[in-house]
Amino acid sequence: MKNSNKLIASVVTLASVMALAACQSTNDNTKVISMKGDTISVSDFYNETKNTEVSQKAMLNLVISRVFEAQYGDKVSKKEVEKAYHKTAEQYGASFSAALAQSSLTPETFKRQIRSSKLVEHAVKEAAKKELTTQEYKKAYESYTPTMAVEMITLDNEETAKSVLEELKAEGADFTAIAKEKTTTPEKKVTYKFDSGATNVPTDVVKAASSLNEGGISDVISVLDPTSYQKKFYIVKVTKKAEKKSDWQEYKKRLKAIIIAEKSKDMNFQNKVIANALDKANVKIKDKAFANILAQYANLGQKTKAASESSTTSESSKAAEENPSESEQTQTSSAEEPTETEAQTQEPAAQ
């Protein structure tokens, strides 16, 4: 069914999560299935399923969900979850119930998944805010294009898009009139305003518009719709570009939002935030069947890093004792010439 496979990219079979959770709260010898001459207990089921890939992912999701609920539970409201739920339901329309069923979800279990995702999202954004530096602001400013006024044509067919582009290239062609006639958007909307950090317009469209001068028209831009998995085709004309101010601090608030949004999409950064939360929760794996579920977060957390740095310092001290002259030479060199890291370190920007 259309869209059903894209309900939640990160969701594993929720039935497995529930089954594993049930195993924690039910006596191991509780019989869940009886048959002639035999029974299946909770323990039987647990041992049979715990090594499967689905159960491994389910346990990982369960751990992360519990940890973030404990640490950030008061940061996400029921209203936020409901809003996200209804937005997804609207996107799927009449196929939403079928999509839920195909993903082994109910409205309530889906809402729990949304809540878990939003808790992690909150933690990632807060971590990104704390790490903002002047250097990052300046880098973001270099690639930033202020507000652009554009006219955009949206089409469903590549051949049609190419044909429309040829019309637009003809001498005396009226872009606005052609756009209103050809675009497939609701209410024939063709005028838009956005900057280079916009997230409500396809990334490739934003990039194309940012590279154009006033009056410039793009080639056909092909974009895969993340909801329908159908390609859309765009042609944009930049009608006006705001002049870029010379001081990056004039855009500080907007640059901050862009930097945080980019970090929030960075999987490496997300993993570091999750690793720190797991460290703080002091998560210990008691069943060796799940020994590797947190492997992707190994050596990323602050505690792990601190332990590693402590070990390195200890080894350096031991080496210094064995060869004091070399140690003194290294210290003198360090004092005279700052490291590259020290030279580039910036104070966090004011929040």
From Swiss-Prot:
GO biological process per UniProt: protein folding
Keywords assigned: Cell membrane, Isomerase, Lipoprotein, Membrane, Palmitate, Rotamase, Signal
Catalytic reactions of this protein: [protein]-peptidylproline (omega=180) = [protein]-peptidylproline (omega=0)
Membrane topology: Lipid-anchor
Comp. bias regions, Low complexity: 303-317, 326-351
Cellular component, GO annotation: plasma membrane
InterPro entries recorded: Foldase_PrsA, PPIase_dom_sf, PPIase_PpiC, PrsA_foldase, Trigger_fact/SurA_dom_sf
Lipid group attachment sites (S-diacylglycerol cysteine): 23
EC code: 5.2.1.8
Keyword match Metal-binding: no
Region (Disordered) location: 303-351
Signal peptide location: 1-22
Record lipid sites (N-palmitoyl cysteine): 23
Molecular function via GO: peptidyl-prolyl cis-trans isomerase activity
Principal EC category: isomerase
Cell location: Cell membrane
Record-annotated PpiC domain positions: 145-240
Transmembrane segments: none
NCBIfam families the record matches: PRK01326.1
Role this protein plays: Plays a major role in protein secretion by helping the post-translocational extracellular folding of several secreted proteins.
Family as reported in the entry's similarity comment: Belongs to the PrsA family.
UniProt protein name: Foldase protein PrsA 1
Species: Streptococcus pyogenes serotype M6 (strain ATCC BAA-946 / MGAS10394)
